[in-house]
Amino acid sequence: MKASSNITPNTQQIAGLLMKIALVHLRHAYSGGVELYLNQMARYMAEKGEDVTIICRSHADTPPHPNVKFVKLSGFSIGKSHRLWKFAKAVEKHVKESDYDLVYGLAHAWTHDVLRIGAGTSLHMARSLNKPMRIKDRVTHLIEQKAMAPGAYYHVISNSYKSAQEIQEAHHVPKEKITVIHNFVDTNRFDAQRIEKGALELKQQIELDPNKPIFLFLGTGYERKGLKQTLTAFSKLNIDAQLVIVGRETHEGEYIKFAENLGIQDKCKFMGEDKRPELYFTLADCYVLPTLYEPFGFTVIESLACGTPSITTENCGAKEVLNPEVSSVIGADVNPDELAKAMAFWADKKRTTNVSEQCRALALTMDVETVLEKNYQQLLAVYKMKQQSANT
């Protein structure tokens, strides 16, 4: 990974030269938290004039910016575990044969100059779900070990102090080599005033009662996100409320049956996947994410941006940016009684107080452009570090 010049980043920008940078992630798509970061970061750097390539195994039809290129490494593999390892090996080979100035790893590889931890660690994920590590998890853990081995990187960016602590524990990454930059929110997309009409139309379309509190559960992977705990807590409420469930889940039928067994099926609306989360955050009175493991949780601050208070847990990295005026953070054991108490507290606050203004104000401090600039400056600092290392 030999750098193409010996000038500093600041001089590079003044001279109008491009930094040839690659972002590495197994999957490019327009859904998922890490994928959201990948697209926004690639777009931002392309707008800065950098030469941006996304190295991946699969990608969507269109890049996040017209000038962003794809390098697709999709060799033959058998099963998910083999696919992960083969991709990491293919990235290693491709990078060695290329002349990138900076390689930014987002996951699933060990060849990079700077690494971002956006999905936590496989070890802590398994522990949080109280499950043994599967073969895929063990392969992921091995890739993580190589990715964070001494000499494998110049610096690590973490999206929460929670994740930073986990990589220190699991992979012995020195504290001084970690920078924490919390996630961002697109405050233009997630703006209740802008989409108020669409949210009202959706509320009418799915026949929600405007006179009853609306709780929202939204996310992919219902077990980890805590849907059973949400349904149980909802069944304990002494108020007449509604629960909307949005997301992608292979075993959705099991959760519908669980709601039926609790006798709350008539108050629950299972919507399946919907790529308009901003509408749901806007129509809801409270967003509920009682997660068992969440390195950060984009949805928490997306909810705030739409003026909707949230409930999450000590297992969620987003707790680091929250305050009691806009949210409740319940214990790591995700006790349904504690969750029900928090839900009852927030049921009418959006209608009776100025909490929406407070939510929006907090979200604006995490606007996407502001946070991406912090990330960009950190990458430039690593690039300078790499240049200095090459000259010694």
Give the ranges of each region predicted by the language model.
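A conserved mid-protein helix/loop that constitutes part of the nucleotide-sugar donor-binding site
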Residues: 36-40, 213-236, 253
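Aromatic "clamp/platform" in nucleotide-sugar-dependent glycosyltransferases that forms part
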Residues: 292
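Glycosyltransferase donor-sugar binding loop
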Residues: 57-59, 185, 218-220, 242-255
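Short alpha-helical donor nucleotide-sugar binding micro-motif in glycosyltransferases
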Residues: 273-274, 280-284
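Short hydrophobic beta-strand element within catalytic cores of glycosyltransferases
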Residues: 309-312
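Nucleotide-activated donor-binding/catalytic signature segment of Leloir-type glycosyltransferases, i.e.
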Residues: 255-273
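Carbohydrate-associated surface elements
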Residues: 162, 184
